Amino acid sequence: MAAMISFNDVSKCYPGGFEALKGITLSIDQGELILFSGHSGAGKSTLLKLIAAIERPTSGSIIVGQQNIGTLRRSAIPYLRRNIGMIFQEQKILYDRNVFANVMLPLQVTGFDTRTSASRVRAALDKVGLLDKERADPITLSGGEKQRLCIARAVVHRPSLLIADEPTANLDSNYARDIMAVFESFNQVGVTVLISTHDRMLLDSTRHRIIELKQGKLVA
């Protein structure tokens, strides 16, 4: 069976000469949950952004769902991302909207009808344990609850792939375990989950595959 995602000798160099990734070759199968570890600046975030076509490789090839990210037309990127749920640190919660409306936003953008959207939003909130908070203002949520809100927004369109960049950063160990349990619950129903983290507690306690990066290279 072909891999869901494959990197073949991928490098990424930014303007100014900084090489974030160097000769990365790896395969990811459908249904895996993988933790990407490494120091700050190791290349974890860049790798995830390449998968979502937020960045493009400088050299090498990346195949995601049989599509070559390096040659993918700009007009095709929204279709690729319909199958990807993304949680990045720079994503912002909209504090002028309640929890329900925050999760509804991706469905409004893609043109879902109101009834279907409402059903999907409540299903996503239920999955992350926030259904009783749907009318709450985000400012009233705890740090862990805000991260659950971001996860619900990422999965409301029911993607087959979920990528999360440092999702437990700035959370205490109990909240971090809760967030990891949410990701595992999605993985248990077949969603491929890719998480970048340098959270030692998560890395030491996981039973899932760990891929370590150091200065842009895979650690053997």
PLM segments and residue spans:
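Conserved ABC transporter NBD signature motif
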Residues: 60-68
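Helix-to-loop junction immediately C-terminal to a conserved catalytic motif
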Residues: 52
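A short, proline-enriched helix->beta-strand linker immediately N-terminal to the Walker B motif
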Residues: 156-160
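Catalytic Walker B motif of ABC-type/P-loop ATPase nucleotide-binding domains
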Residues: 162-165
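ABC ATPase NBD coupling module
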Residues: 15, 69-85, 188
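Conserved ABC ATPase signature
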Residues: 137-141, 145
